[in-house]
Regions:
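Conserved donor NDP-sugar-binding/catalytic core segment of glycosyltransferases
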Residues: 113-145
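Short, acidic, metal-binding catalytic loop of nucleotide-sugar glycosyltransferases
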Residues: 35-44
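A conserved acidic beta->alpha catalytic loop
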Residues: 43, 49-61
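Short aromatic/hydrophobic "clamp" motif used to bind/position activated sugar donors
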Residues: 101
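Cell-envelope/extracellular polymer assembly enzymes that use nucleotide-activated donors
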Residues: 15-18, 46, 191
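Acidic donor-binding loop at a coil-to-helix junction in glycosyltransferase catalytic cores
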Residues: 185-192
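Glycine-rich, basic loop-to-helix element that forms the pyrophosphate-binding segment
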Residues: 79-96
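A recurrent flexible, glycine/aromatic-enriched loop bordering the glycosyltransferase active site
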Residues: 129, 137, 143-169
Length: 274
């Protein structure tokens, strides 16, 4: 599928999309996520960055955006360094100006067509929210790339087929991330997804996982074991990867990962991208 091809011309949207990033002290990663935002083809958008990092870090983010000429970025400091991840995400929602919200993690990357395609899909299905069912996953330091399918070839349906970090939704004041307890610091996006899924129509975005790259780099919220378990349980087969090799070769041009890159399916190495 051509990701830029509209599902239906009537399903185009011009609503502002607010991309919401929470970050602290991962400057190199945050810069790449900002660049990913800057390269989006969807025109009416903003990037709201909420950080409890120190002033030099905040200044570095602002300077990077200004020097690169990237418009529509706001860097906000909550005034406290003791807030949970869930509380910081809620601050980003409150600060958003758009009618559509999109989670924009500082260590994941989106294809330039991601916002346009997901917003169009959500509108076409008259949904309150949308999540990908599949995405790319890059594992360091080995440097291998996989295509993760949360639906597990269709065996998972409903909530279990959705990738929580890929949220896009219409603004809705009913929904907030947990701000206390263990879920407020890790897994808050899964809890939020459960709440949204139970309350509004959700449009799963299937088969377009090349539009989103999930990266393990050693400083993620979740452990290496978690990321490897995601790969072991949900990696697409080598045959599926070979079928979509041309799509992968084109998509990988937009992602900041080293080449050559080994593409690995559930049976092992499939091919190499240069």
């Amino acid at each position: 599928m051509n990701p830029s091809a509209p599902e239906n011309a009537a399903n185009e949207t011009t609503a502002m999309i607010s991309c919401l990033m929470v970050t602290k002290d991962r400057l190199a990663l945050a810069k790449l996520a900002i660049r990913s935002y800057a390269e989006q083809t969807y025109p009416d958008r903003e990037l709201v960055i909420v950080t409890d990092g120190e002033e030099p870090f905040r200044s570095a983010l602002t300077s990077y955006a200004d020097e690169a000429g990237i418009a529509g970025i706001r860097v906000l400091h909550p005034g406290s360094s003791r807030l949970t991840l869930g509380a910081l995400r809620n601050i980003s929602i409150q600060a958003a100006r758009g009618d559509i919200l999109c989670q924009w993690d500082d260590d994941d990357y989106s294809h330039p067509e991601r916002l346009a395609v997901q917003a169009r899909h959500m509108l076409a299905h008259a949904a309150g929210a949308s999540f990908f069912t599949d995405h790319l996953q890059y594992i360091e330091p080995e440097g291998f790339l996989s295509w993760i399918d949360w639906s597990m070839d269709g065996r998972n349906q409903g909530l279990r087929q959705l990738a929580p970090g890929t949220l896009m939704m219409h603004r809705d004041a009913r929904f907030r991330y947990p701000e206390s307890g263990p879920d407020a610091r890790r897994g808050e996006d899964w809890v939020f997804m459960e709440t949204v899924y139970a309350a509004v129509p959700v449009a799963p975005l299937k088969g377009l996982g090349h539009l989103y790259l999930y990266r393990y780099h050693g400083r993620n919220t979740h452990s290496r074991e978690h990321h490897m378990n995601v790969w072991a349980d949900r990696a697409r087969s080598n045959a599926q990867l070979l079928h979509d090799a041309a799509t992968l070769r084109d998509a990988i041009r937009h992602y900041p990962i080293p080449r050559p890159c080994s593409v690995v399916g559930r049976e092992g190495p499939a091919f190499v991208l240069n």
